[in-house]
Design a protein with these regions (language model features):
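Generic alpha-helical structural context detector
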Residues: 117-120, 136, 157-160
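Catalytic-loop motifs flanking and including active-site residues across diverse enzymes
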Residues: 92, 111, 151-154
Length: 163
């Protein structure tokens, strides 16, 4: 796959709509040409302990952050006519659909690909198919795991190798 947008969300709690950060990496002709990162005020607006332990974000980080529709207005032109790619598509696509629903936005039915599924086919011998493991197999060192932009960049790297 030569043209796509890798996407990753982090959530504040167990609600898929509670996206608190997003990372996007734009790939054209097999090269990373742009990226985008934003904190987002989650909906519902509370953090649970476990999610904060994973990504390190808390209420204070997103108190002054924009709400999702304002962030998506910046993302939409970047990803126009591009398929989306995520590592564990059900999670990220689920987040996107849930937050669109919460804000009563029309979901454009994005074409979505999954590097997790692809890695299970391409690298059957791996002990696991977690993002950092698959990224390393593809020659990418993921240093800031669970930062949405770092995870989107790792996903883009994987997608360029196996999709």
């Amino acid at each position: 796959m030569k043209d796509f947008a890798a996407i990753d969300f982090e959530t504040a709690n167990n609600e898929r709509s509670s996206v608190c950060s997003v990372g996007i990496v734009i790939v054209r002709n097999g090269e990373i040409v742009d990226s985008f990162y934003s904190l987002i005020q989650p909906e519902p607006n509370y953090y649970n302990y476990w999610c904060s332990q994973v990504h390190g974000l808390c209420h204070e980080d997103t108190d002054d952050a924009p709400v999702f529709p304002k962030v998506w207005a910046q993302i939409e032109p970047l990803i126009e006519n591009l398929p989306l790619v995520a590592h564990n598509k059900p999670f990220d696509e689920g987040c996107l659909k849930a937050v669109f629903r919460v804000y009563q936005m029309d979901y454009p039915d994005y074409e979505f690909y999954d590097t997790l599924v692809a890695s299970r086919r391409a690298f059957r011998y791996l002990e696991n198919h977690q993002l950092h493991t698959v990224a390393a197999e593809c020659g990418y060192c993921l240093e800031n795991h669970h930062n949405a932009l770092a995870d989107a960049e790792a996903c883009a790297w994987i997608a360029r190798e196996i999709l």
